[in-house]
Amino acid sequence: MSQDFAHLSVLLAETVDGLNIRADGIYIDGTFGRGGHSREVLSRLGVDGRLIAIDRDPQAIKAAEQFANDSRFQIVHGGFGQLANYVEELGLVGKIDGVLLDLGVSSPQLDDAERGFSFLRDGPLDMRMDNSQGETAAQWLARAEIEDMAWVFKTYGEERNARHIARCIAADREKTPFTRTKQLADLIARVAKSKERNKHPATRVFQAIRIYINSELEQIDQALEGALKVLAPHGRLSIISFHSLEDRIVKRFIRRHSQGEELPHGLPVTEAQLNKSRTLMPVGKAMKPSDVEIEQNARARSSVLRVAERLPF
């Protein structure tokens, strides 16, 4: 049994501030984790408020037992990409006042060697957010073609040595299958042609495999579209990203829906037509953690918070 690992929620106050909490509102925490953001949301809700939390990690579902006696709270075991489906089942489409997403892997997942996310701790090569189902990283590495591995490393890890590393993995697995995180990390450290200062050579490959195994970017796309569908007028989106691939998706989504559809040039357009084509309004600028927060929690360094509001048109 894995021990319980602590988790410091990044940009905690700022993210919940972004939701502009109403005491009687209905909110979604799409990435419950260990409940840091949920706890803060609940502290700002009144007796008639409601919080629906979602997580696909069985350990997160167990952690949600801390709120078992709070009638305002409920937890759903599943991926945040399906949030629109869960809301539809509850009959709450168009009634959600805010959606919070804290993307990427959590500290407890990284710190628990048995989960297989970290190249700094030796453990089984798993990397599944929901370790009760799906293909493990070890299983994928055992069957993937060189071209497929190279594509994943390049696309999801922006790894410059993607093809070379893929070839080396394919050659080594003929002798010994990759089953441990240290085994893979040591190989990458040995064969990487170029190394980045203050970054372990395996960082990008581990990120890439994790994103691929968990379909993380597809989940983000689905969650954003789903959030837009379920938000009430003036409902808020408050989203924390941890690397450029995540943030790019969020930034482009907000930009696309705040600029609206492209309308014919040279033809008269009514204000109603302009408004109808816009569904979101950015709230403030992208926010990064303070130096104080980074000093207290080094993993906050790369985080970016973006907030947007559902327009009432």
UniProtKB/Swiss-Prot annotation:
Predominant location: cytoplasm
Function noted in UniProt: Specifically methylates the N4 position of cytidine in position 1402 (C1402) of 16S rRNA.
GO biological process: rRNA base methylation
Coiled coil region boundaries: none
Pfam family, one: Methyltransf_5
Reactions the enzyme catalyzes: cytidine(1402) in 16S rRNA + S-adenosyl-L-methionine = N(4)-methylcytidine(1402) in 16S rRNA + S-adenosyl-L-homocysteine + H(+)
UniProt-recorded name of the protein: Ribosomal RNA small subunit methyltransferase H
Highest classification ranks of the organism: Bacteria, Pseudomonadati, Pseudomonadota, Gammaproteobacteria, Alteromonadales
Gene encoding the protein: rsmH
Disulfide bonds: none
Biological source species: Shewanella amazonensis (strain ATCC BAA-1098 / SB2B)
Signal peptide: none
GO molecular function: rRNA (cytosine-N4-)-methyltransferase activity
